[in-house]
Amino acid sequence: MKNLWLCASLVLLLGACAKDDSSQPSTQTAPAVAMGNGKANTWVNLDAQGNPTALGFTLSKGALDQLPATLPGTEYMLALPDAATQKTPFRYVMIDWNPLGHEPAGIYDVPHFDFHFYMMPMAEVMQIPPYAVNPTGFDKVPAAAYLPAGYVRNPGGVPAMGAHWSDVSSPELHGQPFTETFVYGTYNGHVTFWEPMVALSYMRTNPTLEQDIKQPAQYETPGYYPTHFGILAKPDGSYEVSFSNFVKR
């Protein structure tokens, strides 16, 4: 299993955060964790009614530098602010740094990040076994309505993550270099994470990305769900990775 940097303790994952006056549009932030030569921390923007308008994390200047070369990779666990876990289906964020990428060869075997926005408790995620040990949870898939059209399940599954579903229209699956894509995750019949997957080389281009997230027809858990995903390189050398345009489902 990957080296797990429990940079945020279980106490932090219960939702420690900083709050602003809820009578006005506001931002809640969670404690930062060390990453590379910088840090990472999550945040949620709220409207005057306390509902989410954007949710994501900031990678400070230096966070992409001097990342570990340890294989198979390093995981950074980020707490989410209280309002994020109360209003959206997301429980926490796990940043997976893959210095040599991962399978399939020739597509995702380049240095990249898996930005997992998890919908299940961390303790349950950590108990997901290797596929070869017990494939049952991986093979039990949700009803088709809970996944976007055009997504197919990848073979097998990943311990402490689950099964991964890919968008068959993604350019890297049709001979183009991998830059970024959007993955869905499932386990034991439930959608368990939404995952932007982004190449380090693409992050280094200082992108301004804003795109729609392909949506399922139905949502298992009531709450506010994002419809847009973005990456913004800022003048101070930091990056914002965000979900936005939330809709109550």
Residue ranges, per PLM feature:
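Short N-terminal edge-element motif at the start of the domain
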Residues: A32-G36, A48-P111
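Bacterial Sec-dependent N-terminal signal peptides
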Residues: N3-A34
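Phosphate/adenylate-binding glycine loop and adjacent helical scaffold
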Residues: Q24-P25, G38, V44
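N-terminal export/targeting leaders of redox proteins
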Residues: K19, S23-Q24, Q66-P68, P104, ...
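Intrinsically disordered, flexible peripheral segments
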Residues: M35-K39, A48, P52-A63, M122-E124, ...
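A general structural signal for short secondary-structure junctions and capping/turn motifs
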Residues: K2, V44-A48, A105-D109, G230-K234
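Histidine-centered catalytic micro-motifs
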Residues: I107-E124
